[in-house]
């Protein structure tokens, strides 16, 4: 039904089932994702649409790097650049991550840059700031880092103001 969420759940299931072999703690795992993947990871953090629906343990934390909170604002750009089909409309545009936040949501480390042109194109205030606000309102443990001169697609941020964010998380 939702291939990206199914992929995340299969990965979590595989890793937790092989926890001893991989030397990981299956009861306290984190999901790290960037950009649109950050939205997918965020939806996975919702019990109804994510981890519980797919019968895997709840994430111990979500690390969301410059996530897309509200894809509906991206629709004009995606329509212009890509062949947007019904599947994408159903699984991306219908989810606004901040609307899925609830008090039992996993703890979140959220970061993004003020110079992120993609987030600006998609309505900057409706992305990271809106997600942070929802986390705050629902009392979800979280940390937000906003970097001045950081754009989109920089991964772990080597050579940027965001360098070291992964250690901070």
Whereabouts are the PLM-identified features?
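The feature captures the conserved acid-bearing segment of alpha/beta-hydrolase catalytic domains
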Residues: 54-61, 67-75, 89-129, 133, ...
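Extracytoplasmic/secreted proteins, especially bacterial periplasmic and envelope-associated proteins
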Residues: 3, 7-10, 14, 39, ...
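Primarily recognizes the serine-hydrolase "nucleophile elbow" in alpha/beta-hydrolase
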Residues: 10-76, 92
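Accessory recognition modules or surfaces
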Residues: 1-6, 98-111, 121-122, 153-166
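Mature catalytic domains of secreted/periplasmic carbohydrate-active enzymes
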Residues: 36, 56-65, 72-85, 89-91, ...
